[in-house]
Amino acid sequence: PTLIAASPTPTASPTPLPGAVNLSQPEYEKQGPNNCGPATLSMYLSYYDWGKNQLTTGAALKPNAKDVNVMPYELADFVNEQTDKRALWRYGGDLHTIKALVNAGFPVMIEKGFEPYSLRSDGWMGHYNLVVGYDDEIEYFTAHDSYLMSYAPWGGQIPQELWDTFI
């Protein structure tokens, strides 16, 4: 008998993502005081023709007006319990995953450190953004920011110090 060497099993390689994707724009909503989570979630849901606003999300997520924080699991729970949509949340995301989700047609709600620092009055704080596009050629992400502006560009990468806290 002749011994034949087994050929290596081919390794599947991921399909490369396109260099640029921009989703249709959800309805922009400027946040009320300390209301970036409810406002950004409302913008996200408007992408799916939800028809309500941050007054609805805020009333459920922050019934106490002095509450300045909404956790990611609370946002997902709101979607799963108060709408006909389904949401999940994860820690440890990366830029490739954000791009893959946007490429698949899903805006991505992320939590990062707030910038610009000149607008912060009480030290570090978290802030939600809704990523709706990217362009690798010019190293650019496009996000809706409920505090700063409707269509906020990020040049290059998400600054690591703003992202690391949530990974």
Predicted segments — roles?
Residues P1-P72, F114, D122, D136-I138:
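Active-site-adjacent structural segments surrounding the nucleophilic cysteine of cysteine proteases
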